[in-house]
Amino acid sequence: SVGIIGANGAGKSTLLLHMNGYLMPTSGTINIGDVYLTKKTQQAIRRKVGIVFQNPDDQLFMPTVYEDVAFGPLNLDLEDNVVQERVASALHAVNCYELRDKPPHYLSCGQKSSVAIAAVMAVGPDILAMDEPAANLDPRSRRSLINLLNTFEHSKIIASHDLDLIMDVCQRCI
């Protein structure tokens, strides 16, 4: 896992958005593993790199938690039983399975953050890229998030001002 730190406006979020293909480079190249980011490879890159936005409200938009987490796998044209398994597994991993029928706008910020992580995990990316994952969390929710992130076997790239979180979760920092 790698932590990315820097001042406001230093480009941490922009870097993550480029890594996922939400932003395309105007010069130079971006490659994830041996895949160069182009319009043709953009979908493949997005399957490899899942991004969790700083504000979960920018990511959660469906009527229920279940539908939000299922959105990505459904767009991969997976069989219904595979989608159900992925959603259940991701929600269990973030301790939010009991919230599956709730509307996201009724959740706490910490719960929304966990559901946003589950939504990305359900797609099955190789890399989780997270932008300020502990922003707006109370100390208890922040500690729960750190514990959760430390259970993941995914490669993680975390952009944050929270140096303690970076030290607790990441092996390297740039």
Give residue spans per PLM region.
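The feature captures the beta-strand-to-loop junction immediately N-terminal to the Walker
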Residues: 5-7
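Conserved ABC ATPase "signature" region
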Residues: 81-99
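H-loop/switch region of ABC-family ATPase nucleotide-binding domains
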Residues: 160-161
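Conserved ABC ATPase signature
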Residues: 103-107, 111
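Helix-to-loop junction immediately C-terminal to a conserved catalytic motif
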Residues: 20
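Catalytic Walker B motif of ABC-type/P-loop ATPase nucleotide-binding domains
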Residues: 128-131
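Conserved ABC transporter NBD signature motif
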Residues: 28-36, 45
